[in-house]
Swiss-Prot record:
Residues 157-246, 271-344, 356-416 are annotated as: Disordered. This is Tensin-4. GO terms for biological process: protein localization. GO terms for cellular component: cytoskeleton; cytosol; focal adhesion. PANTHER family: TENSIN, TENSIN-4.
Length: 696
């Protein structure tokens, strides 16, 4: 039959024959009858047929076909219809049945093959057996190539080539109102989703079929496997008819590449748990055959559905269609559903395993496992979640700064700290304003692993780490002035654009913050002598309060303070002291033609005096002023400000004896460098120390 008839998708109605509208020339062959019924898009009619000379036996076969059609028509009619039909002319009111039409098409095209259907009823089975028996008895076929059907006439023609045979498939039971789907067996790439089938419908009074699909683009109900022997076995040509409409859908199940079926199955095996994959043992069939997609159809529950109607597509593989949870499935299976669509199809991140997003698999869901047949191939494509978990847990220099949370199965034996715990306890281990001596005093009575981090007084922007180590680890030479019995080690944590890094340890990675540094070293020691123990309370313990004046003086002397300031200049004030000396020194400095260039220094106050450390080593390295040489320390009485980076900064200074001229005093001027570290703290401490010295 012509491709235009099969691919057009026209609805041809079987109506009683009418008078011929156009007559053809009589056939020259005496073997053919004068009148032969044919069909057009308008109606059935009996027209003189123009055909080439047939082989011997052709007229007998045509007569037998007409007799068989008449017998089949009489069988399908009821008793009342047979009585009424006997009084009418057979040629004027022929009501062809579905089986008679199939037999007529078979007589016209011997290569036409009827597809087996177990749900067509006993009449269809008997008709199929009769037609197959007649086909065996008639080995010789008519030399008719195809039929050209137009709106006005129909004739037999000799075509240049033989067309493919159409396949008649009653889908899922008896067709509604005698309708018949004729699916053209042509390549899928050359077909259109809207022009794939021709439906012949008659006016027989047959009951509607509840399983007849309304459209090929809708979701197709699940079918049993072909090997199960079920009456709903999928015909060979039906799968091709199902695949073509999917190519025009919004989201295509299979891409156009030859290996798309393989990659899609691998994506499903990666995301689905092992319990779901075990119910589909045949998913690892031969993927090299052309029918690899159709061979992977598996048997599902009768109450489940293969696809969702809203998707407007019918997945050809149940595993591929299980990307979304479905309401008709059981609850455990619905919980185990995961996105199985590969990123190459959906261009999204749906196929990324959950372990890559949350850091660990979902609780109450086993990690995805691969089938033995796909193990080697999948390993080359993507790493399994179990391997990812092992890679995350193993220490490496390429690990992220923030360690991932522990497994939801339960906490580890050593209770590895988390980032939240480290940040919540930072008030105990981060003391930016304390000095080196204070850090030693805090850790003196603590256990090995206790630590404290402070701002470095020698390197701007860096941090000092004081760590209490074990006795076996205290083999390194001690620095000058350091007591070996204290077992306190000091390390410098450098800060740069890459992050924070332990100075002198090339094997140490860079961390994004101090919290990440502490959290990682509390899990692994790395370059440190021992692991860090995160404190959960104040280090050194709280000392009991006392009203004793001696104890008050001692505690006051032990207190020290420090901050970063801008060193402006040093001005000789002769014999002046107090606030007047600071006021005069500031006035002299601001009246200069060229203002001094400030430098950042660390201003530290202890019971021994004031120690200045040039952070940038521009003006001096370190200066120390004993407490006995100090005279005064305070702010500018006139509240003048120093313009620092377009922001005003308060000016203060202290007065001390000159180291070169014992009779003169020198005022050293400073400006606040950071609002977080105000100068009021060091000024108050110096004033308190001077008052205590005068009392003594």
């Amino acid at each position: 039959m012509s491709s235009s008839l099969l691919a057009g998708g026209h609805m041809v109605s079987l109506t009683p024959c009418e008078e011929s509208r156009m007559a053809l020339h009589p056939t020259p062959s005496p073997g053919l009858p004068a009148l032969c019924p044919y069909y057009t898009t308008e109606s059935w009619g009996t027209q003189p047929l123009m055909a080439p000379t047939l082989r011997k036996g052709s007229s007998d076969r045509l007569q037998q076909a007409q007799q068989a059609e008449a017998r089949a028509h009489c069988l399908l009619q009821g008793p009342g219809e047979q009585a009424s039909g006997a009084s009418q002319d057979l040629e004027s009111c022929i009501d062809f049945s579905l089986e008679a039409l199939n037999q007529m098409i078979l007589e016209i095209d011997p290569t036409f093959q009827l597809l087996p259907s177990g749900t067509a009823g006993p009449q269809a089975e008997s008709t199929n057996s009769i037609m197959s028996r007649n086909k065996k008895e008639e080995p010789e076929a008519l030399d008719i190539k195809y039929i050209e059907v137009t709106s006005t006439r129909s004739r037999y023609l000799d075509g240049p080539q033989r067309c493919s045979s159409p396949c008649a498939t009653p889908p899922f039971g008896s067709p509604r109102s005698g309708s018949l789907f004729l699916s053209r067996d042509i390549p899928r790439e050359t077909r259109s989703s809207s022009n794939e089938s021709l439906i012949f419908s008659g006016n027989q009074g047959r009951g509607p079929s509840p399983l007849t699909p309304s459209s090929l683009s809708n979701a197709i109900p699940c079918r049993e496997s072909r090997t199960s022997g079920s009456p709903l076995a999928t015909p060979p040509g039906w799968e091709k008819g199902l695949r073509a409409p999917q190519r025009g859908s919004r989201v295509s199940i299979l891409s156009a590449s030859p290996v798309s079926d393989v990659s899609y199955v691998f994506g499903s095996n990666q995301s689905l748990p092992h319990s779901s994959l075990s119910s589909y043992p045949s998913s690892s069939r031969s993927l090299g055959s052309p029918a690899s997609s159709s061979s992977s159809l598996h048997s599902l529950d009768r109450g489940s559905q293969c696809g969702r109607p809203s998707d407007a597509q019918a997945p050809s593989n149940p595993i591929l269609g299980m990307g979304q949870p479905q309401a008709v499935q059981s609850t455990p299976v619905a919980k185990e559903q995961a996105s199985s669509c590969p990123a190459s199809v959906t261009n999204s991140m749906a196929d990324i395993p959950i372990v890559l997003i949350n850091g660990s698999p979902e609780p109450q869901s086993p990690p995805a496992q691969r089938t033995p047949g796909h193990q080697d191939s999948v390993q080359s494509r993507v790493t399994s979640p179990s391997h990812l978990c092992q890679a995350i847990k193993s220490p490496s220099k390429t690990l992220p700064d923030v360690p991932l949370p522990a497994s939801p199965d339960g906490p580890a034996k050593d209770m590895q700290p988390t980032m939240k715990f480290v940040m919540d306890t930072s008030k105990y281990w981060f003391k930016p304003s304390i000095t080196r001596e204070q850090a030693i005093n805090l850790l003196r009575t603590e256990k090995p692993g206790a630590f404290v981090i402070r701002d470095s007084s020698s390197y701007r922007g860096s941090f000092g780490l004081a760590l209490k180590v074990q006795e076996t680890s205290a083999s390194a030479p001690n620095r000058p002035g350091e007591d070996s019995s204290d077992l306190i080690r000091h390390f410098l944590i450098e800060s740069s654009a890459k992050g924070v890094h332990l100075k002198g340890a090339d094997e140490e990675p860079y961390f994004g913050s101090l919290s990440s540094f502490v959290c990682q070293h509390s899990i692994m020691a790395l370059a440190l002598p021992c692991k860090l123990t995160i404190p959960q309370k104040e280090l050194g313990g709280a000392e009991p309060a006392s009203d004793s004046p001696t104890h008050g003086q001692t505690s006051c002397l032990k207190i020290s303070a420090g901050c970063h300031t801008l060193y402006l200049s040093s001005v000789s004030v002769e014999t002046l002291s107090g606030a007047l000396a600071v006021q005069k020194a500031i006035s002299v400095t601001l009246e200069r033609d060229v203002l001094p260039t400030p430098t950042v220094v660390h201003f530290k106050v202890t019971e021994q005096g004031i120690t200045l450390t040039d952070v940038q080593r521009k003006v001096f390295f370190r200066r120390h002023y004993p407490l006995s040489a100090l005279r005064f320390c305070g702010m500018d009485p006139e509240q003048r400000k120093w313009q620092k980076y377009c922001k005003p900064s308060r000016i203060f200074g202290f007065v001390a004896k000159s180291q070169t001229e014992p009779q003169e005093n020198v005022c050293h001027l400073f400006a606040e460098y950071d609002a977080v570290q105000p100068a009021s703290q060091v000024i108050s401490l110096v004033t308190a120390l001077l008052q205590d010295t005068e009392r003594m």
